[in-house]
Design a protein with these regions (language model features):
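Conserved N-terminal structural module of periplasmic/extracytoplasmic solute-binding proteins
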Residues: 7, 23-130, 429-437
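C-terminal motif of bacterial Sec signal peptides marking the signal peptidase cleavage site
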Residues: 18-21
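Hinge/lid segment of periplasmic solute-binding proteins
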Residues: 56, 126-180, 191-192, 302-303, ...
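A structural signal for short loop-to-beta-strand junctions that line the ligand-binding cleft
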Residues: 114, 119-122, 149-183, 204-208, ...
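Extracytoplasmic/periplasmic solute-binding protein
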Residues: 170-174, 179, 196-238, 244, ...
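Glycine-centered hinge/linker elements that transmit conformational signals in sensory
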Residues: 234-264
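Extracytoplasmic/periplasmic substrate-recognition and gating elements
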Residues: 293-356
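C-terminal capping/gating helix-and-loop segments adjacent to ligand/active sites or protein-protein/ligand interfaces
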Residues: 357-360, 376-432
Length: 437
């Protein structure tokens, strides 16, 4: 993926012989560390966050390449990234900074950064399930000092864990990442939306059953696990087997054959909310504005409902994680890059992110001040009550395609009550088998 970079001058006075930032700039003047030096460079990034005021006063002229989703740089959402970087530069007058902005979605970080680590951005945003790939490619710095202290102080333990590997912290979180339920308040009461079966008995609901990020929620509800109870035990593998998993498959066979069930694909759920043919759908904060526009005063949003399996209520649980700011270890001035990452994940930056783009913050103090936003409540209730941290162990990559195909088989009628046990066992085997084996 080529970098789409727009250079923006952030300070008036820049030295003629300007040093490049941590990553390679378009001018090719980067002093990025070689592969042999990357370990020491990463360690420098770890300690830079606790640099003294004396180091802060050091005159530095540098270029930083910063990547974010295009929406963070768009004029119609207030140019959040440019605004924050400008404010950061103003607060550090001894650091003469030019920023080069590039477009990279958080979910694409592992593919884009690892393609050319030394040429990648100095500071970038990533989804936490990208973390193991970024670490393996030496594309992200281990953080330390004041940065780690602030991450631990400002976030829940679950958020801290989402950006940690083997006890080390690799990113500054700025939002949770999960999905929940939107519904039409004219169709369902607050009590009815607590149970999916109660809802579907009354009106149409849409669910992306063929999307592997969503389908696991039913199996986890009934005790199935992915890589152990906390998602970190790679040796445990995926446990979607036995009676507990077959019971879920039987439930899903009934669900997809219910005349009030709509398989959400290619935006059909949102379209259904707009035209009134669907009364509930499952998605994340990225659809909030569109759902609000579709439902108006009947806009409802809550954490996930329960489902009823063999007469017992079981809590659906979505995958959840975080989005965070990471630092490329190939830095000439890691203290500048780490300080910017810390700033972009600060309470002030999260507040601006929320006000400009509806990005729900994860800073606990800031969240305590937002008490009248149903979206914020739903996302954080989901994260805290009705989700599991999405595993980011290496073998999680074996899960996605089999789960997607199984959802398609359910919709196509290939999975039935008669073959539920057999098909579930095949699913479990596939999710525990590498595609290259």
């Amino acid at each position: 993926m080529k970098k789409k970079v727009v250079s923006i001058m952030m300070t008036a006075a820049l030295a003629v012989g300007m040093l490049a930032g941590c990553g390679n700039s378009d001018s090719g003047s980067s002093n990025a560390a070689s592969g042999n030096d990357s370990k020491s460079t990463s360690e420098a990034g770890s300690t830079s966050a606790s640099a003294s005021n004396a180091a802060e006063e050091e005159e530095i002229t540098t270029t930083l390449t910063v990547w974010s989703p295009s929406e963070d740089q768009a004029s119609d959402s207030g140019e959040w990234l440019q605004t924050m970087c400008n404010q950061f530069a103003e607060e550090h007058p001894s650091w003469h900074i030019t920023s080069d902005y590039g477009v990279c979605a958080e979910s694409d970080a592992k593919d884009t950064v690892t393609q050319d680590v030394e040429g990648a951005a100095d500071v970038y945003m990533f989804a936490n399930d990208n973390l193991t790939s970024l670490i393996a490619a030496n594309g992200i710095s281990k953080l330390g000092g004041q940065t780690v202290e602030e991450v631990k102080e400002n976030n829940s333990q679950a958020i801290v864990d989402s950006v940690s590997v083997d006890g080390d912290i690799y990113g500054v979180p700025f939002t949770t990442n999960t999905w929940f339920m939107y519904y039409d308040k004219s169709a369902f009461t607050e009590d009815e939306v607590k149970n999916l079966d109660t809802m579907i008995a009354k009106d149409k609901i849409s669910f992306p059953i063929t999307n592997s990020w969503y389908i696991a929620s039913f199996y986890v509800a009934n005790g199935c696990t992915l890589f152990g109870e906390d998602g970190t035990d790679e040796a445990a593998g995926v446990d979607f087997e036995g009676d507990k998993a077959k019971a879920v498959t039987d439930y899903l066979v009934d669900l997809v054959n219910n005349p009030n069930f709509v398989s959400d694909a290619d935006g059909s759920g949102l379209s259904g909310l707009r035209d009134g043919s669907v009364k509930a759908m499952f998605s994340g904060s990225w659809d909030a504005s569109a759902v609000k526009e579709a439902l108006g005063d009947n806009y409802g949003v809550v954490q996930l409902p329960t489902i009823t399996i063999n007469g017992e209520e079981k809590q659906m649980k979505s995958f959840s994680g975080s989005k965070a700011i990471g630092v490329n270890p190939n830095c000439e001035y890691p203290q500048v890059a780490v300080a910017l990452a810390r700033y972009l994940g600060s309470a002030d930056a999260q507040k601006a992110h929320y006000e400009m783009r509806n990005v729900v913050p994860c800073n606990e103090e800031l969240l305590s001040q937002i008490t009248d936003d149903a979206l914020v409540t739903a996302q954080n209730d989901t994260f805290n009550n009705t989700s599991i941290i999405q595993p980011f162990v290496k073998n999680m990559s074996n899960y996605w395609t089999p789960a997607e195909n199984f959802g398609k088989s359910l919709v196509n009628g290939e999975v039935t009550h008669d073959n539920a046990a057999e098909m579930t066992e095949k699913l479990n085997t596939s999710m525990n088998t590498s595609a290259v084996e």
